[in-house]
Amino acid sequence: MNGKEGFAVWITGIPASGKSAITRELVARMNSQGLSAAVLESDVLRTILTPEPTFSSKERDHFYLQMALFGAMLARQGIPVIFDATANRRAYRDHARTLIPCFVEVFVSCTVDICRERDPKGIYAAAARGAASNVPGMQAVYEPPLNPEVTVDCREAPLINAEKIFTQIMALRYI
């Protein structure tokens, strides 16, 4: 690892693009090398930080600020961090980058049509029924990264995408 500081990988993409599957494979790849990481999964943290989420812009601003701060605290302790979170605004991810010097942004490129077909949590179906009104990539804006360190295709296997990310982490000498 690069000095005492940990590093962070923020895996972003619209809902159902495969972020969590890629995260699981990246953790497994790191574990295979004797490395561990703290995974900050937005779905899990949201149940703690916003138990009754509205997904409003104001709530998202606050939530992603907290998430970035948690990640920075861990990274300062030398703990690698993997963010598994849509973070629909660039500003959320850019803020984390300012807090964590060793930072890798990963964009999971995926069309809304593919995500709508996958829809494991039913959020696109809920949006179609009018029951969800803030789905990133549909009613809410999703701002893809301008210059991510890694871009992966959601149609590729999560294992292949995780290997691309791991290779970039190694190339940057974060591990």
Features from the language model and the residues they span:
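Extreme N-terminal, non-catalytic leader segments
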Residues: M1-A8
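The conserved Walker
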Residues: P15
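Conserved nucleotide-binding/hydrolysis micro-motifs of P-loop NTPases
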Residues: V44-R46, A87-R90, S109-I114, A157-P158
